[in-house]
Design a protein with these regions (language model features):
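Metal-dependent de-N-acetylase/amidase catalytic core
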Residues: 1-4, 23, 45, 79-173
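Active-site rim/loop-helix segments in enzyme catalytic domains that contact anionic ligands
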Residues: 1-95, 124-125
Length: 173
C-alpha cells in the first residue's frame, strides 16, 4: 500500500503519527510524508533561521521512514485559501495514495484542524483518511488504538531530533 502522512508542522508526524508509520513501513508499505507549513512560528529565533533549523530537524527525524515533501505554506496562517488547497491536492494527486493519515478535525491547533479539513475535502470521498490522536487526547474519540510499544524507542529518537521544540515534552505522546 502507498501511505501518505500529512502533518501541519515540522515535528507533527514524529509526535502524532510516527509509531503507526513505522509499523506500516516494517510490514512493507510505501511511506510518503508531507509537511504543510514552514514552521516559522515555532520559536523565538528569526523566522528564516528557524525554518532552516526545523527543516533539518524534520529530515533527520523522518530519515528512517522516507524523505518528506515540504509544502512551505505559512505557519499559523492556513485558511480557506485556494493556493493552499491546490498545493495539498497536487501532492495527493502526485502520490495517489491508498490511505492518508493526518490530524483530527477537532485537534487543539487551528493549523491541524484546517489541514485535516483540506485533506478530507480533497480526498475523503475516494481515499480512506485516518485521523491521528490529538495532544493528550483532547477532543478526540478514538475508534481504534495501535500498540506502538515495539517501535516506541525509534519514535522517541525521531521526536528528540527536534531540539528547537524542547522535545522532552512530546516524547510520551
Amino acid at each position: 500500500m502507498k501511505i501518505l502522512a500529512v502533518g501541519a508542522h515540522p515535528d507533527d508526524i514524529e509526535i502524532f503519527m510516527y509509531g503507526l508509520l513505522r509499523i506500516l513501513k516494517t510490514r512493507g508499505d510505501n511511506i510518503f510524508l508531507a509537511i504543510a507549513t514552514d514552521g516559522c512560528q515555532g520559536g523565538d529565533l528569526p523566522k528564516k533561521e528557524l525554518v532552516k533549523i526545523r527543516k533539518k530537524e524534520t529530515i533527520s527525524g523522518l530519515s528512517e521512514l522516507a524523505k518528506p515533501y515540504f509544502l512551505n505554506l505559512p505557519d499559523g496562517q492556513l485558511g480557506d485559501n485556494l493556493n493552499h488547497k491546490l498545493k495539498i491536492r497536487n501532492l495527493i494527486n502526485k502520490i495517489n495514495p491508498d490511505m492518508i493519515i493526518t490530524h483530527d478535525k477537532k485537534d487543539y491547533h487551528s493549523d491541524h484542524r484546517i489541514l485535516s479539513n483540506f485533506v478530507s475535502e480533497i480526498a475523503g470521498h475516494y481515499i480512506p483518511v485516518i485521523y491521528s490522536e490529538t495532544m493528550m487526547g483532547i477532543n478526540f474519540t478514538p475508534n481504534y488504538y495501535i500498540d506502538i510499544t515495539d517501535v516506541f524507542d525509534i519514535k522517541k529518537k525521531a521526536v528528540m531530533c527536534h531540539l528547537s521544540q524542547k522535545p522532552d515534552r512530546f516524547v510520551n505522546l
